[in-house]
């Protein structure tokens, strides 16, 4: 067979966004090419060796529900698993895992190399092939031209990346990897609105030089050990290990303050804005000057290395200051640094220049995903990559894009925030960003999305069969609890008191009993009158059984709140589903303020719902738009890409 040079979809970049994009497109049956500057770094965890967390774990579960690889790879590479917020409500509980970098990367590469319809090729991309307003391919650094009907760009921090350690800096995409300078210049020629952001990473420490006897041990959850994927099993996990905790102190803070005159952040060398929710240690000391100590987590990088990641001291201070501040902390007095911490500054492109499908508004068939859109984090990148891969696949198949709603998925919240509000700093997902978070829980991500994924072609038979059995078991057992009744004659006073604290005085369904505070599904099943289904009829293993029980319990206990939220979603549906004509002339909408006309023309929202979330667009402006649409006015063609396409980011 001749070497193929024409594909349906080309994905540029092999990080968390690029790998999910390539796998999703290929699962849909599209011939897909993944171009990476180095095949050895596919799926590499460039910063912290962990996956998940508050809000982030929700995204990972959604990627998994849609057939993605991140959760499954974490189950195969995870060396510590915890449920965060386990004592709080189900909406904010989140899974977090420490991962062995090597095992995680191996799991991702195995999936890439064994995915039908997917080709891998090691070459950096220097140019995009554009004909008119449509992308038609990519050109590599040695001039190889690949044609594609859609291109997904997932360049991470590589676009014109610059690495800073103290006042020294050099060009790079991350430590040890080259920056994508030519590609960045090419994108600027396309008049896409861009800006500059910054992120950083801490120094790495040799575990042989850490005094663990002085540190607080932080083990993972053991009863039960969590799994990340809905198809995951505890048996997949490698050996589990603890993390360790130390703290900064007054001396540490003095050392950091003494080095600020050589900090690229505080001397104006770095212009990019850093992440608010993952600040550098120098930023923490400056912003929280009254705080006497900060908690630092020492996280193992893997089972076959002595390297530790000190989570909480991301820094770009000079190396001598880094060494001194590390050794000022308890247990690290003799620590040897294996790699210095650094900051990296890179180009991003204003996500308000994207459609909700993640396709650029100015170049048809060109999709962006990951840090190029101004986000931070592996999980945010993977979720965007999955969506961009799906929509690139739908684009080449001539089908309508899938744009998840805010009430449907955290992925919908993420993308809607990006394309309507833009970013002024690296965007991180939190549960607080989702107004419908009680409906968007980790535990029901498959119930929300797997059926959609099946229709899109990204969910295989194995996942679909497992999901169908789980869904049917939850439905069947929930119905049984609602239709099985007990009364003072069938439920003895002793049993009722043991379960509820007092006897019952009239008839209740088992669901009514389960709805009471402190009552569990297992507690109801223990009643002689409960006659619960045998576990083996619900699920074939303990992990799936636990998932089913959790679904049943949450669904019944929170039914009233969930129904109330569903009513709110239904009321807002009219705005979310009302599309704005692509050529709508906002100058013809009577009564709109100058600011509203300017912003609507500039950002070209796709729906009334999107328009309502643009800064400065009032409820009155939305009412005027609705009236205008009902009249069927204002369809004069406009050029949606003309506004906001200068080289500087558009102000909000």
Swiss-Prot record:
A single GO cellular-component term on record: cytosol
Protein keywords: Cytoplasm, FAD, Flavoprotein, NAD, tRNA processing
Gene3D superfamilies assigned to the protein according to its UniProt record, in alphabetical order: FAD/NAD(P)-binding domain, GidA associated domain, C-terminal subdomain, tRNA uridine 5-carboxymethylaminomethyl modification enzyme MnmG/GidA
GO MF term (any one): flavin adenine dinucleotide binding
Keyword Transmembrane helix: no
Chain sites annotated for binding FAD: 13-18
Compartments (UniProt record): Cytoplasm
SUPFAM superfamilies for the chain: FAD/NAD(P)-binding domain
Pfam families the record matches: GIDA (PF01134), GIDA_C_1st (PF21680), SAM_GIDA_C (PF13932)
Binding site for NAD(+): 274-288
Cofactor: FAD
Subunit structure and binding partners: Homodimer. Heterotetramer of two MnmE and two MnmG subunits.
Family: Belongs to the MnmG family.
Role noted for this protein: NAD-binding protein involved in the addition of a carboxymethylaminomethyl (cmnm) group at the wobble position (U34) of certain tRNAs, forming tRNA-cmnm(5)s(2)U34.
NCBIfam families found in the cross-reference section: mnmG_gidA
Database matches in HAMAP family: MnmG_GidA
Name of the molecule in the record: tRNA uridine 5-carboxymethylaminomethyl modification enzyme MnmG
Species for this entry: Paraburkholderia xenovorans (strain LB400)
The encoding gene: mnmG
